[in-house]
Structures are given as structure tokens and as C-alpha cells.
């Protein structure tokens, strides 16, 4: 039994020794490299030497863009490479050890920070280990979640696009000490933000159109002094407006259409029209308040959606004004307003023909003159001519008067047939006795006829003002409908032509994208 355990113990001891020897090589190398190493000193053999530092940005998630705070939140990996002559070794001296992992706090770092941050976090989120190669070159890939400042242009919101940037520079070193560069792969400079399709998470509100990168020199530095280099990574992003179209724009258009449709209510239903229009105004005000909570509080520009909502408010207010004017015209009467000939000609003849509206034909001019006489005459008005009576009285009264006259004539003829003298004397006596009664009857008939014709004239005047109100309501409906359609089309055509440029920088033909394979 003891003889069987001997080989196993020997193998276990050999494995432990080899592992300890491997760890000892890495520990020995780290101890040798860190001996007399000062991480605060720049890795330059001579004072005039410049340390080359290359940067590459990998975007894994565009988290959000807060318009009110004008802050872009991104999840990135920052790839930095530089060489430190103090960290060189010969792999043969350390049994072929080609890579050494060293805590980043133990080596010199170029102090690359995000200049345009908005939360006070300049550095990376995790100080992970650096990878050191035998030639002294260091590879560092720390992750970070940055909140960078992004100036928001709200002119075409929500059909807008934004140009945001992440600006990196060394916090302590100038161009005479370090040289910031963009990373290179296969001899090609990576002048763009790298996106790994497998690791990248698409944003639901923004679509990335361009992602170039550029080297810039600090323009604030004096010409005789060395400035600070900056590496700027740009993100040109286009908003996906579907959310705002479904939840704000479409409801506003439908609600405003309801305000347009109130013209189909009767002209005298002004109260109901105003009630519907004011309810629409309240709903539009709620949507305007929701938009105001989304966009930044700036006076540099007015958002496109705010312009459209304001336009809808103006249209709705005009509809309310139209309803009030139409109601005022429809309720007029001949006692309070006299209709001018021009108004009658335009609103009762010309416009109904143009608008294909059915309006009753106007009375002849003679009837109008006679009706005015009836309106202005006194209770003792007498019938002067048969033509005026025929024009003013209805057919039933004309038949009654003709029958009454024929009866009087027949009675007179019957009296005359009995004898000229007797008949004439009796006829004259009858006339004398009946004269006051006949006169009273005639005056009573005249009063009744005058009152009826005055009422008929009053009703005709009311109907004419009502017809004018109908025509005016139809004109206002067509005007508001045209204004609503033209304004809506014009505003959204402006949004249609607001597109991200085909190239990221005007005048620069380079696309700043990886060349196709």
C-alpha cells in the first residue's frame, strides 16, 4: 500500500515545484522590473524624448442622451498603448515569459482623462491590470461609463440629429512630453470609434450615422508654448422619431381635426362650437407641457414640435373666433342691423354659387320696397293701388277681398233692379248707415295685413342673416382646413429635409470608416 502511494506523491511534488517555479519566474521578473522603478517619472531616456501614446475607443453601448441636461452617457473601452524602456526584459532569462500582468497603479500612466465630462468623473471606472511585453510596450484596456457634455440643437426636435463628442487629453503633459496618436492596425490609422457588432447594444432612440475621430491641438495655448493635444471622438446620431409621432404628433393632429369638424355644426350652435374648441385647446396645452419637459430650457431656438403645437393652438383659437363671429351674424335681425346691398350680393349670390350652396332665391326689388313701406308705415296706412296690394298680400287674402268686392257689387245691382228711384235711395241710405262700419272694417283689415307683412318681412330678414352666417361659416371652414393642411405639410417637410450630412466633416471627402474588405 505504501509502495503504491510513492509515485503519486512524487508526481504531486513535481507539479507543485513546477508551479512554484513558474510563479517564481513571474514574481522574479516583476521584482526585477519594479526595482528602482518610479511610476511618477515619465518613461523618457532623455529629457527631449517624447513618449508616443496611442488611443482607440471601443463603444459597447450608447446608453442615453439627456436633452434637458445636455449629457451623453456611453459605455466604452479605452485602449491605450505606450512604451516604457524601464520595463524591458529578455524572455530567455525568464524561461520564455512573454507577457507580464502588472497592476496599473504600479506603472507610469499618461493621465488621459475625459475633458468634457459633466459629472466630475474624469478617469476610468476600473483600474485593471496592464499587459507588458518584453520590449517594454504597455497595453491597457480599462472600461468606463462616461457622461460627456453634448450641446443640443432643438431646432428640429423630434426630427433632429446631434453631434456629440468625447474629448480626451493628458491632464499633466504637453506636446513636448507625450505625443497622442490614434491607434494603427495593419498600417491603417483607426480614425473612427470602433464598434464590435457582437458586443454592441443598439439604442432604441438614437441611430449612429457617423463616428469619426480626429487629433486636435489646444487652440488656447500660446504659439510660443507647447499646447496639449486632444483626441476627439465624434458621434453623429439621428433620432428615431417614431415614439414622438405615435404619442404626441398623431394625437395632436387628430384632436385638431376635431376642432376643424365643428364647422359642420349649425351656424346658430355657437355655444357647442366654442365648448368643443376650448376642450381641444386644453388638450393641446397638455401636449405642449409634455414637450416642454423633454427639451432643454434654451432660448436659442424653438423646437419644431413646439412650433407645430403653437400653430395648432393658433388655428384652434381662430376657429373659436370664427364661431363667435358666425354666431353674431346668424342672430342678427332687421330691427338691429340692416343688410347692405354689397353684403347681400356677395354672401347671398356670389359666394353660394362658388361654394355650391343651396340658398333660396331673393324677393324682387318691388317687394323689397313695398315691405320697407309696410315696416315704416303707420296703423292708418291705406291701400293706394291694386298692384301694391297684389304684391304684398298673400293669395288667400287676395281671393277673400275679390270675393268680398264681388258680393258688394252684386247686392248693389240687386237693389237697382227693383227700381231706379227706390233702389237708388235705399242704396244711398244703406251706404250712409254702413259707411262707419265699412271704414272700421277696412282699417282693421289694413292693420292685420300690415302686421302680417311686417312679421313676414322680419322673418325674411332673420332668414337672410342666418343664410349669411351659413355662408360665412362655410368660408371659414375652407380657410381653416386649407391653413391646417398647408401648415402641417410645411412644418413636416422642413423636418423631412433635416438629415445627417453624407460626410462627417464638410469639405473633407474621407468617410472616416474602415475600408471594406
Curated annotation (Swiss-Prot):
GO terms for molecular function: acetylcholine receptor activity; acetylcholine-gated monoatomic cation-selective channel activity; channel activity; transmitter-gated monoatomic ion channel activity involved in regulation of postsynaptic membrane potential. The chain crosses the membrane at residues 241-265, 275-293, 309-330, 475-495. Its main location: membrane. Residues 331-474 are cytoplasmic. It is a multi-pass membrane protein. It comes from the Eukaryota. PANTHER family: NEUROTRANSMITTER GATED ION CHANNEL (PTHR18945). This is Acetylcholine receptor subunit gamma. It comes from Homo sapiens.
Amino acid at each position: 500500500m505504501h509502495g503504491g502511494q510513492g509515485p503519486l506523491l512524487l508526481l504531486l511534488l513535481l507539479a507543485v515545484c513546477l508551479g512554484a517555479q513558474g510563479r517564481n519566474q513571474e514574481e522574479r521578473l516583476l521584482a526585477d522590473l519594479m526595482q528602482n522603478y518610479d511610476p511618477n517619472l515619465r518613461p523618457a531616456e532623455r529629457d527631449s524624448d517624447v513618449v508616443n501614446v496611442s488611443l482607440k475607443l471601443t463603444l459597447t453601448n450608447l446608453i442615453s442622451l439627456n436633452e434637458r441636461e445636455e449629457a451623453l452617457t456611453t459605455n466604452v473601452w479605452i485602449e491605450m498603448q505606450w512604451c516604457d524602456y524601464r520595463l524591458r526584459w529578455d524572455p530567455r532569462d525568464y524561461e520564455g515569459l512573454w507577457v507580464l500582468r502588472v497592476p496599473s497603479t504600479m506603472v507610469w500612466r499618461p493621465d488621459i482623462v475625459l475633458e468634457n465630462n459633466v459629472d466630475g468623473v474624469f478617469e476610468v471606472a476600473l483600474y485593471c491590470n496592464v499587459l507588458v511585453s518584453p520590449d517594454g510596450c504597455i497595453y491597457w484596456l480599462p472600461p468606463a461609463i462616461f457622461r460627456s457634455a453634448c450641446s443640443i440643437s432643438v431646432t428640429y426636435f423630434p426630427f433632429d440629429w446631434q453631434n456629440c463628442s468625447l474629448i480626451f487629453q493628458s491632464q499633466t503633459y504637453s506636446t513636448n512630453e507625450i505625443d497622442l496618436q490614434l491607434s494603427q492596425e495593419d498600417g491603417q490609422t483607426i480614425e473612427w470609434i470602433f464598434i464590435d457588432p457582437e458586443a454592441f447594444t443598439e439604442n432604441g432612440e438614437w441611430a449612429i450615422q457617423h463616428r469619426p475621430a480626429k487629433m486636435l491641438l489646444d487652440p488656447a495655448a500660446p504659439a510660443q508654448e507647447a499646447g496639449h493635444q486632444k483626441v476627439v471622438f465624434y458621434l453623429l446620431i439621428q433620432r428615431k422619431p417614431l415614439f414622438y409621432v405615435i404619442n404626441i404628433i398623431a394625437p395632436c393632429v387628430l384632436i385638431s381635426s376635431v376642432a376643424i369638424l365643428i364647422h359642420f355644426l349649425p351656424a346658430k350652435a355657437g355655444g357647442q362650437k366654442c365648448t368643443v374648441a376650448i376642450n381641444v385647446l386644453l388638450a393641446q396645452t397638455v401636449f405642449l407641457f409634455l414637450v416642454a419637459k423633454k427639451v432643454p430650457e434654451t432660448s436659442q431656438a424653438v423646437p419644431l414640435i413646439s412650433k407645430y403645437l403653437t400653430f395648432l393652438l393658433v388655428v384652434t383659437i381662430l376657429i373659436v373666433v370664427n364661431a363667435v363671429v358666425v354666431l353674431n351674424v346668424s342672430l342678427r335681425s332687421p330691427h338691429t342691423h340692416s343688410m347692405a346691398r354689397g353684403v347681400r350680393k356677395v354672401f347671398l349670390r356670389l359666394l353660394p354659387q362658388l361654394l355650391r350652396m343651396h340658398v333660396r332665391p331673393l324677393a324682387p326689388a318691388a317687394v323689397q320696397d313695398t315691405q320697407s313701406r309696410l315696416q315704416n308705415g303707420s296703423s292708418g296706412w291705406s291701400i293706394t293701388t291694386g298692384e301694391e296690394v297684389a304684391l304684398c298680400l298673400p293669395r288667400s287674402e287676395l281671393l277673400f277681398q275679390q270675393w268680398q268686392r264681388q258680393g258688394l257689387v252684386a247686392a248693389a245691382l240687386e237693389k237697382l233692379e227693383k227700381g231706379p228711384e227706390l233702389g237708388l235711395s235705399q242704396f244711398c241710405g244703406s251706404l250712409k248707415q254702413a259707411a262707419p262700419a265699412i271704414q272700421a272694417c277696412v282699417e282693421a283689415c289694413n292693420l292685420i295685413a300690415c302686421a302680417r307683412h311686417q312679421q313676414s318681412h322680419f322673418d325674411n330678414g332673420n332668414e337672410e342673416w342666418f343664410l349669411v352666417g351659413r355662408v360665412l361659416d362655410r368660408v371659414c371652414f375652407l380657410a381653416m382646413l386649407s391653413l391646417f393642411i398647408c401648415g402641417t405639410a410645411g412644418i413636416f417637410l422642413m423636418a423631412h429635409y433635416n438629415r445627417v450630412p453624407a460626410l462627417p466633416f464638410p469639405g473633407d471627402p474621407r468617410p472616416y470608416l474602415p475600408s471594406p474588405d
